[in-house]
């Protein structure tokens, strides 16, 4: 079960996680992860829809059917974006193409993930220069699954490649660029040891009115395995997450 949250800038549980082991296992699976992780692809698509709907309403017009379409000539409301736990770049590519930021800092625990996102980095192949118009059948560059139902707004017409960089390290200790407009991630937060401290750090690095947007797993994820074996990650409930955020952030949207 997934939770999505968008939080505007405005009781800590610490769990013991072998991050070196986590990094090795994700690195080992990196060549097949993008092909097999269909749920993560769907989560990334939904995250982008929620982000554009709830965190930047001035950049989109909403139809009666609830879908979001781009407004002609609008610039992205997020000039500087950080994605922690970028993995193989599924969500990264959606952010890059839909929001077209000036800078995009990608972070992951695994240095090997650079191989999976090399096409987005200056040393890799350049991104294609092509129109990015709203189209129900558009397939964003690099996405594994066509986004026929995603209907995300695409800002501008030509694709302008921003300064994309990759920094492999533990996001819990990473000093993000000061004045970041959006700190975001999909399906990563559950691996963190001290979530409350991380939220505090995010607040420090966000710009005035900046956004923290993330999805993570809920308490019922892998519940049967946890019950049978007694092993598994400790997940927060939705109310627990909101409580951790309440002292520093205004919650714009949260769902389970």
Q: Which sequence ranges carry the predicted segments?
A:
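A short SAM/SAH-binding and catalytic strip from SAM-dependent methyltransferases
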Residues: 181-195
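Substrate-binding/catalytic lobe of Class I Rossmann-like enzymes that use SAM or dcSAM, i.e.
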Residues: 234-256
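Short, small-residue-biased leader/transition segments that mark boundaries at the very start
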Residues: 1-7
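Class I SAM-dependent methyltransferase SAM/SAH-binding core
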Residues: 80-136, 142, 156-174
């Amino acid at each position: 079960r997934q939770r999505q949250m968008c939080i505007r800038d405005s009781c800590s549980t610490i769990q013991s996680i072998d991050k070196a082991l986590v990094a090795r296992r994700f690195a080992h699976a990196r060549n097949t992860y993008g092909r097999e992780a269909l749920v993560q692809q769907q989560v990334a698509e939904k995250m982008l829809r929620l982000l554009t709907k709830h965190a930047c309403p001035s950049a989109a017009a909403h139809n009666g059917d609830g879908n979001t379409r781009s407004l002609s000539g609008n610039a992205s409301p997020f000039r500087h974006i950080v994605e922690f736990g970028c993995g193989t770049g599924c969500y990264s590519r959606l952010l890059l193409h839909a929001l077209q930021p000036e800078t995009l800092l990608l972070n992951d625990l695994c240095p090997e993930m650079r191989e999976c996102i090399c096409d987005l980095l200056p040393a890799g192949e350049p991104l294609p220069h092509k129109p990015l118009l709203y189209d129900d059948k558009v397939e964003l560059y690099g996405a594994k699954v066509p986004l026929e139902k995603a209907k995300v707004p695409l800002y501008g017409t030509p694709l302008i490649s921003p300064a994309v960089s990759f920094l492999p390290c533990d996001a819990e200790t990473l000093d993000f660029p000061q004045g970041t407009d959006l700190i975001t991630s999909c399906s990563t937060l559950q691996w963190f040891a001290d979530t409350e401290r991380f939220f505090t750090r995010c607040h420090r690095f966000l710009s005035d009115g900046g956004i923290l947007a993330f999805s993570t797993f809920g308490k019922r994820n892998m519940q049967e395995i946890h019950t049978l074996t007694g092993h598994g990650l400790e997940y927060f409930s939705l109310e627990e997450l909101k409580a951790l955020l309440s002292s520093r952030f205004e919650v714009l949207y949260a769902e389970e």
